[in-house]
Amino acid sequence: MSLILGRFHCLLLLAGLSLCSTVFAQGRSVDYEVQGTVYDGYFVSAGKDAPLVMLVHDWDGLTDYEVKRANMLADMGYSVFAADLFGKGIRPTEVKDKRQHTGELYKDRSKMRSLLRAALKQAQSLGGNTDNAVAMGYCFGGAAVLEWARSGDKLKGFATFHGGLATPEGQDYQHTQGKILVMHGSADTAITMDQFAALTNELESAGVHHEMITYSGAPHAFTVFGSSRYREDADKKSWARFTGFLESELKE
């Protein structure tokens, strides 16, 4: 079912009346198949020439949270494809189920990469400008985005919000092509500052252009609206930096 966001811009007339025009960003769920399994993504277009953002969900699966973030970006002039890495209808609510679905992909990095590339291909089929694209991810999605960066695929940039930072054994960033932006809460007990420092050293050694930012007092999942972990200051600052990253890396 299509989801439509409207933005209303009112022009005041000299007579004291107002005339409102409506600009619509249309978003919709998109079913696509990868190796016999159906996945359910979300695509919102800001126009055929708009830069593209590939968004990867956290361990809850693709939910209203990612849809909201996608629509926020569309309102700024970016087309967005929110990928589904779990499968249609799989939106785990229990921790054990979340661990199961993320764990399966952590153990099968080849499948993770295939799903990311399939999502990019689907975005392209819908008119997304894949030659002018950045990938972003939250938590598990952040780890997936770094996996994508290590694959050597040619995206303009890779951004993570409180994402997993550890590099699997046998992998490195020698083939990474885009710039990397990492936004991390210094009070995150799930992903430690030791991992943050280790990634910084890896990227520096590999010669990857990177920016690593920490936010004091911010725990894991500090951007999730309405949760006990939400930190407004860190959320607003990280979002502002991310949108600045998009402006600098994507051609208008």
In which residue ranges do the predicted regions lie?
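Conserved alpha/beta-hydrolase "acid-adjacent" motif
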Residues: 190-195
